[in-house]
From Swiss-Prot:
Disulphide connectivity of cysteines: none
Name the UniProt record assigns to this protein: Putative lipoprotein MIP_01412
Topology class, membrane: Lipid-anchor
Major place of residence: membrane
Family: Belongs to the mycobacterial 19 kDa antigen family.
Keywords: Cell membrane, Lipoprotein, Membrane, Palmitate, Signal
TM spans (from-to): none
Gene Ontology CC: one annotated term: plasma membrane
Superkingdom to which the source organism belongs: Bacteria
Length: 139
C-alpha cells in the first residue's frame, strides 16, 4: 500500500510540475483579412500567441499568409515586423528600423496593421519589389 501511495504522489507531483511549465494554449481566431497591393485575401487559420509583452500573430499557412509581431510594452504598441508569404503574388517583409513602414491600431483584441513591405513578386523572384499591405485580425 505504501508503494502505491508513493507512486501516486510522484505522478501527482509530475503532473503539477508539467502544468506549471507548459505554455498556454494558442488562441485561434476565426478569420483575418490580408490585402496586398489591392488584392484581398481572407484566411480562416489564425494563431495568436504571447510571450511577456510580445504578441505573435500567424495567419494562413507556411505557403500563403502573414506573420505579425507586436510589441505591446511600447507606448503606444508598435509593430516589430510583418512577413508576407505569397499573398497577391507578393512575398516580403517589414522590420522595425529597416526599410518600409507599418502603422498599427488596436481596439480591444482587434489589430489593424498597414504599411509598405519590401520583397519580390512571386512570378519574378529575382526582381526586388515593394508592396502596400493592410492586415486586420482579431486575437
Amino acid at each position: 500500500m505504501r508503494n502505491r501511495t508513493v507512486a501516486a504522489g510522484a505522478v501527482l507531483t509530475a503532473a503539477l510540475l508539467g502544468a506549471c511549465t507548459s505554455h498556454p494554449p494558442t488562441h485561434i481566431s476565426s478569420t483575418a483579412s490580408v490585402t496586398v497591393n489591392g488584392h484581398d485575401r481572407t484566411f480562416h487559420i489564425v494563431k495568436c500567441g504571447q510571450v511577456q509583452w510580445t504578441r505573435m500573430i500567424d495567419i494562413g499557412s507556411e505557403f500563403s499568409g502573414a506573420k505579425v509581431v507586436v510589441d505591446e510594452n511600447a507606448q503606444p504598441a508598435t509593430t516589430q515586423s510583418v512577413r508576407i508569404r505569397n499573398v497577391g503574388g507578393f512575398s516580403g517583409m517589414y522590420s522595425q528600423g529597416g526599410d518600409g513602414n507599418a502603422d498599427m491600431s488596436m481596439t480591444g483584441d482587434k489589430f489593424t496593421v498597414s504599411g509598405t513591405a519590401n520583397g519580390y513578386q512571386t512570378d519574378k523572384p529575382s526582381e526586388p519589389a515593394a508592396a502596400t499591405f493592410k492586415i486586420v485580425v482579431t486575437c
